[in-house]
Amino acid sequence: EVLNKILTLAAQQGIGEEPVEATEPEEDEALAALDQGDYATAEAAYKRLIARKPNDSYAKLGLAQVQLLARTHGLDAAKIMEDAIKSPDDIDLQIQCADVEVMSGYLEPAFDRLLRLLVLFDGDEQKRIKDRLLELFALVDPADPRVMKARTQLANALF
């Protein structure tokens, strides 16, 4: 009973409440669009926010998340993963599979998949694989050991 009174008093004083963070209008627009499943509008809103505030890490993360959602929306993850096993050198399929894996929380397999593919190709194909890896890295905390390891492997593969 005493604990409940303390918690009630604390709440009345605003203690323990989450601070309300101000959001940018573009972010509000993006989130509203996402609620409607409108990935194109959400992506455009985040791009406008990044154009206005180029160092906004939350906007960059939001954009990367929206782009991943758009790429994986409606995909049959199990079929893509099956097909990726059957066609290990199909760049489109492997990139799509990596997206599905990241979306499912399987970061290391996704990174390993693209890193393996990276050394098999050069030129435009290699650039495409590298660019997707960098996009996927942007979805994860840069201090995450899985990202740090994959970034090192990427650098070693390219140089």
Each PLM stretch: what is its role?
Residues 1-15:
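Non-catalytic, surface beta->alpha helical segment in thiol-disulfide oxidoreductase systems
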Residues 21-52, 79, 83-104:
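Alpha-helical segment of the N-proximal tetratricopeptide repeat
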Residues 47, 81-85, 115, 134, ...:
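Alpha-solenoid helical repeat scaffolds
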Residues 54, 87-89, 105, 122-124, ...:
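Short coil turns that delineate tetratricopeptide repeat
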Residues 60, 94, 128-129, 147:
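Canonical tetratricopeptide repeat
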Residues 65-81, 135-159:
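Alpha-helical linker/edge segments of TPR/alpha-solenoid repeat scaffolds
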